[in-house]
């Protein structure tokens, strides 16, 4: 009995109707394979890639994706302690002044919480070290990925190297973070470092000290705190949105007006629903940031900023601190 015909089907036998199920894919930049730094896309992609060969053995070496995993984990978990600090600071510098409508009354609540977040050891543990780790891990992670892109895809000309380097690939979330670094540094300089240099500590620094600074230079401090609070709140809210999977401030752009000729037939049936969901998330996240920044500024500028000048020896001490501030002391 002749054996059955086991040859492959001819071209004419192929069900041409299956071609309808093919999807039209838009071209995307090669750098998107690595995901965004802020939302840790690359962690999941690297972990989903199976190991070469038949055996799956634990890798203890510091390979590329392991570097990404560790750096992304540091960048993510280093945001937890500062979030607790900023929540407490938000209550002390905005909510409580808004409720008491008085700087001296709000100062009493600040004194109650001072041992929790202003002691040298605890403050560095929940604020200084995590923020430094967060910024450093982000810088190292971007350099690792930019060098990998240059190695994999080539960067021979100056324009090619520029397109694969550190700065052009930054998302809005990352740009807000790097804008926040000098703003936060100035805040630490005026409220921590200078009092430590002049008085040996910041025990005399409180809401009255900040209100005294507003009287000395109202234009500078109003503009500074307006930018500082807006950038800080947007970065924190946008960062937590990214951790939760709500990508609002990433570099990827949805293609709304660039629909292909076969869209709606080749796998794009849910595109409109996805875009509506993205717009809804955008409004929610940015709405939370607007409300948070507005409340914080209402307490900081509306109550503390109008608290008035200090009196007696305390005002003289504060004047000496502001006069000793380096670089920006002439504006204060």
Name each region found by the language model.
Residues 1-332:
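Membrane-embedded alpha-helical bundles that constitute the cytochrome b-like, heme-associated redox core
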């Amino acid at each position: 009995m002749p054996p059955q015909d086991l040859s492959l089907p001819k071209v004419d036998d192929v069900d041409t109707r299956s071609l309808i199920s093919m999807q039209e894919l838009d071209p995307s930049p090669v750098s998107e394979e690595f995901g965004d730094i802020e939302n840790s896309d690359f962690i999941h992609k690297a972990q989903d890639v199976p190991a070469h060969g038949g055996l799956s053995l634990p890798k203890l070496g510091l390979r590329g994706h392991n570097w990404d995993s560790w750096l992304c984990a540091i960048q993510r978990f280093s945001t937890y302690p500062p979030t607790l600090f900023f929540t407490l600071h938000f209550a002390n510098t905005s909510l409580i002044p808004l409720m008491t409508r008085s700087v001296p009354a709000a100062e009493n609540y600040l004194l109650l919480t001072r041992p929790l977040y202003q002691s040298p050891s605890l403050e560095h543990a929940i604020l200084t070290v995590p923020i430094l780790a967060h910024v450093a891990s982000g810088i190292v992670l971007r350099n690792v990925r930019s060098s990998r892109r240059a190695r994999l895809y080539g960067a021979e000309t100056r324009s090619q190297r520029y397109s694969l380097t550190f700065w052009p690939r930054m998302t809005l979330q990352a740009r807000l973070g790097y804008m926040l670094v000098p703003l936060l540094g100035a805040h630490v300089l005026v409220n921590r470092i200078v009092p430590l240099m002049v008085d040996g500590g910041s025990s005399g620094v409180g809401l009255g000290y900040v209100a005294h600074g507003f009287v000395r230079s109202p234009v500078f401090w109003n503009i500074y705190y307006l930018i500082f609070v807006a950038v800080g709140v947007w970065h924190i809210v946008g960062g937590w949105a990214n951790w939760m999977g709500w990508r609002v401030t990433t570099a990827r752009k949805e293609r709304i007006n660039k629909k292909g000729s076969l869209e709606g037939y080749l796998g794009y049936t849910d595109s409109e629903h996805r875009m509506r969901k993205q717009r809804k998330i955008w409004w929610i996240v940015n709405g939370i940031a607007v409300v948070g920044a507005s409340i914080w500024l209402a307490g900081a500028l509306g109550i503390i900023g109008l608290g008035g000048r200090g009196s007696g020896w305390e005002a003289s001490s504060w004047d000496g601190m502001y006069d000793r501030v380096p670089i920006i002391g002439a504006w204060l």
